[in-house]
Amino acid sequence: MARTLGKTLSSQELDFYRDSGYLIRDRLLGPDKFEALGEHFEGKLASLSPEERPEDMDVPHFTDPELFRWLFDEDVLDLVAQIIGPDIALFSSHFFCKPPRDGKSVPWHQDAYYWRETINPSTEAITIWLAIDPSTRENGCMRVIPGSHLTREARYRDVTRAGSVFDEELDAAQVDESRAVPVELLPGQASIHAAGLVHGSEANLSSSRRCGFTMRYISTEVRFNHEGLGHKHQIYLARGVDRAGNVYADPTRSYPEVIGNRGRGQSYLGTRRPGA
């Protein structure tokens, strides 16, 4: 598993990402920035109502502009630019937290499948998964199938078991679990993965919490379906210039109406039904 510490990715690391669809970074933010993010997250987690699941803290930046301190962090964007180019839009973010002995499982899936009505092409996005807590095999760390982002054909089926974050999953015949690699992270470490990479995670049956912050980016050459879905989602120009005629939201504003239009929990936008 390739790991990188410095700001600049080597040609070997970039080749690994292109071939495998993921990469591990030993440090994403400086210590002070990471500590501040952790404190900010703990405040948000503590404010959840009893009926709100900690896995469902999706798109928190729509109503919390302070999060752009980290989403637009120059070190983060420097890293993103090496993978998708200099013109960058923030696509989404998500605090994903699995409480001990209770966290839901995430079935095998490709992010691009759920975004196919939102961005075009939906495969041209990357996700940074920043560990707030240790993410281990015991508490349900992410597992990936290296190289699976290079295969475009995919069949999905309904999830019938309880306790799943999503309501659809890849057909089991399409996933060779013997090739799965656990992505274990210490606090402050981060993984980067392509939108087409097959990945998932088990429920957290351990006594330790597993929380992380996902930051999702696209090149501004990717087209966002603002006409059809602008009432449920927004993107933000993070660096550079627009290349696709996209409409961008204001990072200094709050958009509670967008949250209201999405509904509670994991919303897939478009014509898809919401997940569990």
Predicted feature locations:
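Short, conserved beta-strand element in jelly-roll/cupin
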Residues: H109, T118-R137, E184-L186, I192, ...
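Generic beta-strand structural signal
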Residues: P86-S93, K104-V106, E124-L130, G140, ...
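Non-heme Fe(II)/2-oxoglutarate
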Residues: A2, L45-S47, G196-A276
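Short, solvent-exposed loop/turn segments at secondary-structure junctions
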Residues: L29-P31, F96-K98, Y113, S135-R137, ...
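Aromatic-acidic/polar surface patches that form glycan- and anion
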Residues: G30, P65-F72, P121, E177-L186, ...
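Double-stranded beta-helix
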Residues: S135-E202
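Short, surface-exposed loop/helix-turn segments at secondary-structure junctions
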Residues: Q110-D111, V165-E177, R209, G228-Q234
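Non-heme Fe(II)-dependent double-stranded beta-helix
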Residues: M1-I119, R157, G228, L237-V241
